[in-house]
Amino acid sequence: MPDHVIAKFVLLGELEALSPLMVGTGSGDVIDAVVQRGYKGNLPFIPATALAGVLRHNLASKPQTTVERYFWGDTGGSDSGSQSHLAVSDLLPVAGSVPRIVIRDGIRIDSTTGIVADKAKFNFEVVEPGATFAVRLEATVRGWDGKQKNAAEFESILCRIKSLCEAEGFSLGAMTTRGFGRLKLKNARLFRYDFPADGAAWFAFLSSGTPGEKNSRDFQPVQTSQSTFSIFAMFAIKSSLIIGSAPDTPDAPDKSHLQSNGAPVLSGTSLRGAVRSRAERIAATLGGAKGIELLKEVFGWVDPEEGKKTSRSTPLKSRISIDETIIKNVTPAVQSRIRIDRFTGGVAHGALFDSMPLWNSGDSEVSVKVRLSNFTPGEDDWIAGLLLQVLKDLWSGDLPVGGEKSIGRGVLMGKSAEVSWCDTTVSIDQNGDKTVIDAAGREELNRLAAAFGVKMGGC
């Protein structure tokens, strides 16, 4: 059957970065990980391959249907595969915008000692939140695709793409489980061109870049299934909090709190490290080595010795993601400190330094957002129960976050929380010294906690 084009669909829109974005190209001369650049000299952009990979990973069935094999492409492990009928353009910054790139520092904490691991200091570039990139997807319906039947199914897949990119948890790039790469689709529009009737309109679109309104299509509603267990909690800072950031001017304090677009933030990297460390401690206490082994499939795992033959050499991606959030109603203030020589009892030479933590100004707000992806009720209840145990420790101030914890910083106090999964939402509120949960909600949370106990007891 001759190859001829029946129709083309075009999806246009803008992807706005809701959190720091890191689509890297490897290490640079000075920075360990640099963002993808190249558009108009030095502006960052999102490669088409990055978006196409995320869309296919999230939407393609396993195994793929016949229509999906045409839409996404399929090698089939042989020469009989088909090329993708979806063309994705590189996502360039919208006209007139200049995305801001900043450098962040990172460390790796040794979970055994609780201090920075040897040679585990690194830095990386990120694109600041607010950057907006233009989206263009083009799907081609060809002659062997069953004409109008598969054209309608192609349109349905594009509607699912829109729904996915507008969802709260949509992310792309590196460190997405640490709060990076959160994106949201805005101003989405869909257009259809049927051939040969719309041939002139199509060439006019290619020439001008502006689609004809008569070819505009309405997005069809898409049914989405909820498969996420999530915790959204609000805390207050008991005293002070600092997540260290290197000084950017000579007269700045030796260490100040991390900021994003000028606002102090609770970074997903810092909070996720604290959550994982406490989860491992709980699992090791109740389940021993087998409890720790179970957490590898929850928090992710990479072989620490590259190239070493192990029983599980394939890296595992974390199912836990934690957002980076803005801290409100706090006051930064410099505090000078000294180091005492333990032998003389006097000030050690050259040991005067200062830091600028955030201090509670009376009604501080620190939000925590934790998600467990691909949640299966019953099977994954024990993971939800473990996360509730960690939430309890955060809530009661037993799990400090950030730096300088040994001098009392980073202690949080729970104010309110919502725990959601499937069609269930449980609200938790702190009223003075009492934690308030309705009877039905308390029963559900106790059931999840019991499932974790059974899982660890079975180890």
Stretches found by the model and what they are:
Residues 1-459:
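Small/polar/charged residue-enriched interaction surfaces, especially the RNA/DNA-contacting tracks
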